[in-house]
């Protein structure tokens, strides 16, 4: 069996490492460096350059040189972060047929995973050249705050590059592995990993525990910003240079793609120099030209000026740290070590801010450029079975949830969630005086429960009679470190509960998982339509219920004509809801119609409420009813309507 390599697929730079025995080896690429720029250039002769060669020619080929593509991976074109980048990047960011953000080079439309695969292919070749044998398996890292689509897109990039991705792991966790296995300190330690890379920021609170001679790494919490990194710091310098040049020369460089590419290189260089020096000079001769001749750029920037330009960006990293500490249930003083990861953490202002927040100096014995790849290689060794003294927590491969009103799959735990994990949600009944509910547990990515795998079902009985929506049933999903799923349901009023145990990880074969992913892609549009239809039906049902209730209480205050109009509209909506072939537009039209004709009913209720002023609770209830009668959507109050069937007792 070949070695499983560890790859840090970064926004700005990438790195590959392997384990040789218990020693880690960060592998030099063909240019002799241990990190490779995540830059890809598409040339006129169809040649593709990756890394340093691509970076060297970027000034003369800006439209076809792609960098920071990781910021687009797994994202929709309409997302505000993508829209922001469109105006900043010299290359074209376009909308794919499926609505994703893609890029264009030489007129060819390229998906971000396709572009990232070129970098992964270079990492694969780097490892193969060193080992002298084929490499087919890898552990690839992603920011801890990446969502499911971003993780899946990264996995797709690996597959396109000819790699079987054995695991997608979080960058801070990988850095913690690299740090933890290198230390001799005994006992449990809580560490904070502050990861400020080229395009993303993460902070994770991780507990390293010694369990019977094994090292267990448990992520207590994570937070971050997937659109904040060194690229944003560079952009601040670029904007400053453009502004100063415009003041001095009256020329706007922001529309000149060749000049922008030179400015980007100069900004990155200046930023690095200011990490060790107090001042740097940016000197770019022949940056542009106008009628009066060529223009040269010469500008001095001090460290203080740079810090002023990026102060708010550094500050933006502190709130996620605060949230991560709170979510982990620890105090800042409980943190034993602070690890810095990512090249941007070399900036003195960043180190100073981290020290100020955590109250201690960050560790300097971790290489911020290589730690993540090293951790990925360690996990690769664990997955291959060659290392037994490390206990890593698994992830659930597909989302887990329950069926709710309208046959919708309501996800409780998303795929790629690190386990053990626990999640609870309060649901309610769908009918008045419903005495029992059935909880159906599903696994899969489809929006409608029927398209997913039913793992099991159980009943919760003995619910006291009450109007629909009043009982509070808390459903809890709990996945332990063994990947075993425990599902419980509890009536919060009576304390009655029922539980089942499901082995989630053994619930599906790899073939089924692959088929589900294919199905989800093929049927995404159809699923979305069904989901929208279910939402409209739920809205219609709720409006029928609240309008009937309001008519019972206030109908005698209406004119005969008004009451008849409401009853006719009510009947019309009920009929369309009974019609299984009715589409979303037909239901929405009837909902809107009932909303309009019941306006008067809402006014009567409001007037009655004003007149009576009979206690805050009664007033609130009437106002809620008025909102329904007026056609407004009922506020959920954190209680999700769920469809549970009555369980008949023999």
Curated annotation (Swiss-Prot):
Alphabetical keyword list: ATP-binding, Chaperone, Nucleotide-binding, Phosphoprotein, Stress response
InterPro entries: ATPase_NBD, Chaperone_DnaK, Heat_shock_70_CS, HSP70_C_sf, HSP70_peptide-bd_sf, Hsp_70_fam
CDD domains (UniProt xref): ASKHA_NBD_HSP70_DnaK-like
Superkingdom of origin organism: Bacteria
GO molecular function annotations of the record: ATP binding; ATP-dependent protein folding chaperone; unfolded protein binding
Induction: By stress conditions e.g. heat shock.
Modified residues (Phosphothreonine): 200
PANTHER family: HEAT SHOCK PROTEIN 70KDA
Family statement drawn from the similarity comment of this UniProt entry: Belongs to the heat shock protein 70 family.
Job description of the protein: Acts as a chaperone.
Protein's recorded name: Chaperone protein DnaK
């Amino acid at each position: 069996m070949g070695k499983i390599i560890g790859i840090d697929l970064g926004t700005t730079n990438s790195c590959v490492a392997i384990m040789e025995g218990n020693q880690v080896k960060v592998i030099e690429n063909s240019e002799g460096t241990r990190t490779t720029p995540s830059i890809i250039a598409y040339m006129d002769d169809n040649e593709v350059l990756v890394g340093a060669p691509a970076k060297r020619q970027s000034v003369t080929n800006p439209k076809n040189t792609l960098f920071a593509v990781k910021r687009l991976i797994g994202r929709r074109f309409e997302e505000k972060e993508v829209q922001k980048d469109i105006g900043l990047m010299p290359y074209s960011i376009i909308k794919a047929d499926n609505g994703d953000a893609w890029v264009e080079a030489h007129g060819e439309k390229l998906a971000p995973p396709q572009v990232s695969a070129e970098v992964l292919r270079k990492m694969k070749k780097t490892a193969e050249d060193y080992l002298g044998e084929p490499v087919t398996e890898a552990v690839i890292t992603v920011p801890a705050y990446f969502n499911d689509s971003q993780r899946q897109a990264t996995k797709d990039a690996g597959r396109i590059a000819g790699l079987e991705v054995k695991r997608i792991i979080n960058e801070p966790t990988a850095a913690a592995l690299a740090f933890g296995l290198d230390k001799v300190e005994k006992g449990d330690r809580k560490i904070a990993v502050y990861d400020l890379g080229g395009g993303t920021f993460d902070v994770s609170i991780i507990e390293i525990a010694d369990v019977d001679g094994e090292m267990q790494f448990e992520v207590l919490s994570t937070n971050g910003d997937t659109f904040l990194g060194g690229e944003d710091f560079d952009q601040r310098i670029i904007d400053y240079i453009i502004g100063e040049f415009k003041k001095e020369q009256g020329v706007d460089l922001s529309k000149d793609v060749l000049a922008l590419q030179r400015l980007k290189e100069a900004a990155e260089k200046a930023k690095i120099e200011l990490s060790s020096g107090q001042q740097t000079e940016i000197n770019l001769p022949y940056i542009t030209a106008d009628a009066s001749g060529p223009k040269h750029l010469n500008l001095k920037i001090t460290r203080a000026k740079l810090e002023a330009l990026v102060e708010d960006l550094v500050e933006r990293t502190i709130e996620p740290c605060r949230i991560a500490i709170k979510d982990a249930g620890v105090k800042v003083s409980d943190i034993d070590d602070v690890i810095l990861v990512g090249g941007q953490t070399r900036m003195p202002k960043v180190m100073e801010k981290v020290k100020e927040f955590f109250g201690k100096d960050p560790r300097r014995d971790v290489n911020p450029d290589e730690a993540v790849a090293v951790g990925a290689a360690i996990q690769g060794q664990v997955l291959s079975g060659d290392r037994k003294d490390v206990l890593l927590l698994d992830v659930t491969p597909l989302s887990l949830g329950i069926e709710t009103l309208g046959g919708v799959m309501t996800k409780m735990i998303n795929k790629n969630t690190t386990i053990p994990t626990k999640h609870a949600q309060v649901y309610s009944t769908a009918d008045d005086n419903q005495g029992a509910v059935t909880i159906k547990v599903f696994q899969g990515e489809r929006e409608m429960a029927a398209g997913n795998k039913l793992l099991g079902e159980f009943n919760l009985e003995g619910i006291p009679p009450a109007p629909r929506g009043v009982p509070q049933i808390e459903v809890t999903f709990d996945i332990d470190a063994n990947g075993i799923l425990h599902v419980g349901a509890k009536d919060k009023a009576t304390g009655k509960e029922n539980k089942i145990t499901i082995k989630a990880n053994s619930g599906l074969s790899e073939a089924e998982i692959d088929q589900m992913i294919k199905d989800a892609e093929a049927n995404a549009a159809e699923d979305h339509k069904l989901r929208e239809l279910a939402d409209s039906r739920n809205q219609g049902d709720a409006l029928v219920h609240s309008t009937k209730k309001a008519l019972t209480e206030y109908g005698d205050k209406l004119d005969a004509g008004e009451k008849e109009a409401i009853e006719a509209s009510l009947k019309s909506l009920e009929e369309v809801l009974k019609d299984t072939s009715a589409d979303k537009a037909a239901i929405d039209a009837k909902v809107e119609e009932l909303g309009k004709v019941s306006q008067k009913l809402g006014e009567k209720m409001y007037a009655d409420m004003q007149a009576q002023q009979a206690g805050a609770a009664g007033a609130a209830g009437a106002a809620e009813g008025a909102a329904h009668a007026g056609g407004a959507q009922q506020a959920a109050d954190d209680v999700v309507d769920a469809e549970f069937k009555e369980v008949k007792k023999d």
